Amino acid sequence: MLMPKRTKYRRPHRVSFEGKAKGKNVIVNGNYALVAKEGAFITNKQIEACRIAMNRYMKRTGKVWINIFPHLSLTKKPLEVRMGSGKGSPEEWVAVVKTGKVLFEVKDTSNSEKVEMEALRLASHKLPIKTKIVKKGVQV
């Protein structure tokens, strides 16, 4: 699973995913990309599920770039525990995704647009947010 090797603080403040993405909103590597239409926290398991789905469909003919990484830890207190007594232990790692951020980029060596678009469509079903598939050169 994806998670940082080391962090400065174990339990950081929660970050807002409101507003538009400031960085990584341009397609750099691939021909097609999956772009977020809304903001959310995306967990390391969801990112991994997308990666597996795309790689399985494209087999060895394509390359996938993942532009998000789960840097933020979300904490949770155990069930049936009273309020207070600290924040709770880190439960999962999430990536903060804002509107317009390029999540995944795909390039197929056989230059088959169908394969690239289908791989991104399969990945979009694994995510909890609305996304759109964008071609390189088109405004995100």
From Swiss-Prot:
<comment type="function">
    <text>Binds 23S rRNA and is also seen to make contacts with the A and possibly P site tRNAs.</text>
</comment>
<dbReference type="InterPro" id="IPR020798">
    <property type="entry name" value="Ribosomal_uL16_CS"/>
</dbReference>
<keyword id="KW-0699">rRNA-binding</keyword>
<dbReference type="Pfam" id="PF00252">
    <property type="entry name" value="Ribosomal_L16"/>
</dbReference>
<comment type="subunit">
    <text>Part of the 50S ribosomal subunit.</text>
</comment>
<dbReference type="GO" id="GO:0006412">
    <property type="term" value="P:translation"/>
</dbReference>
<keyword id="KW-0689">Ribosomal protein</keyword>
<keyword id="KW-0694">RNA-binding</keyword>
<dbReference type="GO" id="GO:0022625">
    <property type="term" value="C:cytosolic large ribosomal subunit"/>
</dbReference>
<dbReference type="InterPro" id="IPR036920">
    <property type="entry name" value="Ribosomal_uL16_sf"/>
</dbReference>
<keyword id="KW-0687">Ribonucleoprotein</keyword>
<protein>
    <recommendedName>
        <fullName>Large ribosomal subunit protein uL16</fullName>
    </recommendedName>
</protein>
<comment type="similarity">
    <text>Belongs to the universal ribosomal protein uL16 family.</text>
</comment>
<keyword id="KW-0820">tRNA-binding</keyword>
<dbReference type="GO" id="GO:0019843">
    <property type="term" value="F:rRNA binding"/>
</dbReference>
<dbReference type="InterPro" id="IPR016180">
    <property type="entry name" value="Ribosomal_uL16_dom"/>
</dbReference>
<dbReference type="InterPro" id="IPR000114">
    <property type="entry name" value="Ribosomal_uL16_bact-type"/>
</dbReference>
<dbReference type="InterPro" id="IPR047873">
    <property type="entry name" value="Ribosomal_uL16"/>
</dbReference>
<dbReference type="GO" id="GO:0003735">
    <property type="term" value="F:structural constituent of ribosome"/>
</dbReference>
<dbReference type="GO" id="GO:0000049">
    <property type="term" value="F:tRNA binding"/>
</dbReference>
